[in-house]
């Protein structure tokens, strides 16, 4: 029994390990990977590895894994990566898993600066990446520092601005909050829709020379072949759409492209190594096939996948609506609960107030009763004193009468009688005055007793009103509401230093529609506004001395009103011969 070979395949978000047989082909391994991760849009992807000479290479699907120049490690190391890119992510990517893999790969390319991204776009993309990971911003959950361990912005951008890590995070948090209500899958798609407008997005660059020996870059992407000057990867100078190319071939380091226009000369360039031409050929064939496929009616398989994706998306929308409805119901219940708690607290406070008023009234009533009792005792004492004085007065009157009788009946001396009479008269006058004072005092005490009695009656009435008032309604009871292109490539064949491939352009429709495109920022007013705001904010903190060569090129393109698609239209102007002549003249 042959010994199995251990293989590790790293996707953008997982590591997969397999044991394969020595005769396992690249396609069998590839199929095992896509089956494991549930991917059906297999035509974009491939297995990438570093060969035993240290060059990056794509695994050939029609050859045994063990027969290819994979670096001998245990386990063998492969990366599952996008090899080809769609022209328009919103129109072409069907499955969520496909969208996620592209999102993660493009994000890594931007963060590592393999894809140049201007600062304001980097911050906006960072906020979409946060929405894709965390969902809606919630200040109760996403406390300060929740982004501290996240890679969100290219280091180049951070170095160019006088902002701390916290200040970068604050800016991204503000834009994260703006994406409220956006599904995570939709945030990934919005990220890709903006990223695909970046000049270096989806392009494989190769060092080449023209016949004059000028060092240039060849850019191979989903739309065709572009030529760049050596010091500018952002602005292509000449472009050839796939629909203009009928044959591609190479012999050793010489690469020949034959245009459909037979009056035009061959487009010839030279690569530094044979293996570079092999990679260019593979990418040209694969991208051309996808370019043609997109311009023909969808296959039954793709139609079925799109129908299934629409159904799944519709189902997700229904689930989202249900979740939103449930969330709103919960929020309503919470608000009602909070309202009831507030009302309960208010009622409790009112009840406490009633209790305090009742206790105060009872205390006042008790004090008034005590005061009334004291007044009553004083009144009684005054009355008793008045009665005693009245008795004394009456006795004095009787004595006076007696003396008068005695004055008549007895013979006393005039002086003695007069003296006694004067004495008793003075005494009677004093007693009469004392009696009047006591009567006035009795009247005063009777008046004060009457006032106390009136206060007592009033207090009893107030207490009766408080005690008989209906109690505050009890707080309401809270009741919770229940609730991948398959490469049609063969190996290099018997001739290891050359290969030729015919590129058919028959049966396609609207072959240059990409030239009509505009950027996401141009067609989406919200994105345009966000980018302008960010650009204005960042300009105040930018260190102009740290601008890179790409920054200078990008800013100049912006100043002249150029973008990816306007440049594309410009570099494809004129016939094929004119553009090939222009290439040779570089």
Curated annotation (Swiss-Prot):
Protein name, per record: Ezrin
Phosphothreonine PTM positions: 567
UniProt membrane topology term: Peripheral membrane protein
Gene Ontology MF terms in the entry: actin binding; actin filament binding; ATPase binding; cadherin binding; cell adhesion molecule binding; disordered domain specific binding; identical protein binding; microtubule binding
Gene name per UniProt: EZR
Assembly, per entry: Monomer. Homodimer. Interacts with PALS1 and NHERF2. Found in a complex with EZR, PODXL and NHERF2. Interacts with MCC, PLEKHG6, PODXL, SCYL3/PACE1, NHERF1 and TMEM8B. Interacts (when phosphorylated) with FES/FPS. Interacts with dimeric S100P, the interaction may be activating through unmasking of F-actin binding sites. Identified in complexes that contain VIM, EZR, AHNAK, BFSP1, BFSP2, ANK2, PLEC, PRX and spectrin. Detected in a complex composed of at least EZR, AHNAK, PPL and PRX. Interacts with PDPN (via cytoplasmic domain); activates RHOA and promotes epithelial-mesenchymal transition.
GO cellular component: actin cytoskeleton; actin filament; adherens junction; apical part of cell; apical plasma membrane; basolateral plasma membrane; brush border; cell periphery
Pfam families: ERM_C, ERM_helical, FERM_C, FERM_M, FERM_N
Coiled-coil features, chain-numbered ranges: 302-462
Residues with PTM N6-acetyllysine: 60
């Amino acid at each position: 029994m042959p010994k199995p070979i251990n293989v590790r395949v790293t996707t953008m978000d997982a590591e997969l390990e397999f044991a394969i047989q020595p005769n396992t082909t690249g396609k069998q391994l590839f199929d095992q990977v896509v089956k494991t991760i549930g991917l059906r849009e297999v035509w974009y992807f491939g297995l990438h590895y570093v060969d035993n000479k240290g060059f990056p290479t794509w695994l050939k699907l029609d050859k045994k894994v063990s027969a290819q120049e994979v670096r001998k490690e245990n386990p063998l190391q492969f990366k599952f990566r996008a090899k080809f890119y769609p022209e328009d992510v919103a129109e072409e990517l069907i499955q969520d898993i496909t969208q996620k893999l592209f999102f993660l790969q493009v994000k890594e390319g931007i963060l590592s600066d393999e894809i140049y991204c201007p600062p304001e776009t980097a911050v906006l993309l960072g906020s979409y990446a946060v929405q894709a990971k965390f969902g809606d911003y919630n200040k109760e959950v996403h406390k300060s520092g929740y982004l501290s361990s996240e890679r969100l912005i290219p280091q180049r951008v951070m170095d160019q601005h006088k902002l701390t890590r916290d200040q970068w995070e604050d800016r991204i948090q503000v834009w994260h909050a703006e994406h409220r209500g956006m599904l995570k899958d939709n945030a990934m798609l919005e990220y890709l829709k903006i990223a695909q407008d970046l000049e270096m997005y989806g392009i494989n660059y190769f060092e080449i020379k023209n016949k004059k020996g000028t060092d240039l870059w060849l850019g191979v992407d989903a739309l065709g072949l572009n030529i760049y000057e050596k010091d500018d990867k952002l602005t292509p100078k000449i472009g050839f759409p796939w629909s203009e190319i009928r044959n591609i071939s190479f012999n050793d380091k010489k690469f020949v492209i034959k245009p459909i226009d037979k009056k035009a000369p061959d487009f010839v360039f030279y690569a530094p190594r044979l293996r570079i031409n092999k990679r260019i050929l593979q990418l040209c064939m694969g991208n051309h096939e996808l370019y043609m496929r997109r311009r023909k009616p969808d296959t039954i398989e793709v139609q079925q996948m799109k129908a299934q994706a629409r159904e799944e998306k519709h189902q997700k929308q229904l689930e989202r609506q249900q979740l939103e409805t449930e969330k709103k119901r919960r929020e309503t219940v919470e608000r009602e609960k909070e309202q009831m708690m507030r009302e309960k607290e208010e009622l409790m406070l009112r009840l406490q107030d009633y209790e305090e008023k009742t206790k105060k009234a009872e205390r006042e009533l008790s004090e008034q009763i005590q005061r009334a009792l004291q007044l009553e005792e004083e009144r009684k004492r005054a009355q008793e004193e008045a009665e005693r004085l009245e008795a004394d007065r009456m006795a004095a009157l009787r004595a006076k009468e007696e003396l008068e009788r005695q004055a008549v009946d007895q013979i006393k001396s005039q002086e003695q009688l007069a003296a006694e009479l004067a004495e008793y008269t003075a005494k009677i006058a004093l007693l009469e005055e004392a009696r009047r004072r006591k009567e006035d005092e009795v009247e005063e005490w009777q008046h004060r007793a009457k006032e106390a009695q009136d206060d007592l009656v009033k207090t009893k009435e107030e207490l009766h009103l408080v005690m008989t008032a209906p109690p505050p309604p009890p707080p309401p009871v809270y009741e919770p509401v229940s609730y991948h292109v398959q490469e049609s490539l063969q190996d290099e064949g018997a001739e290891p230093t050359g290969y030729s491939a015919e590129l058919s352009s028959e049966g396609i429709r609207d072959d240059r529609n990409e030239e009509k495109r505009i950027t996401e920022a141009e067609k989406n007013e919200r994105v345009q506004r966000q980018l302008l705001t960010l650009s204005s904010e960042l300009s105040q903190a930018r260190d102009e001395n740290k601008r890179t060569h790409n920054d200078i090129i990008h800013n100049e393109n912006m100043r002249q009103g150029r973008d990816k698609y306007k440049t594309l239209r410009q570099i494809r102007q004129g016939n094929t011969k004119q553009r090939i002549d222009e290439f040779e003249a570089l």
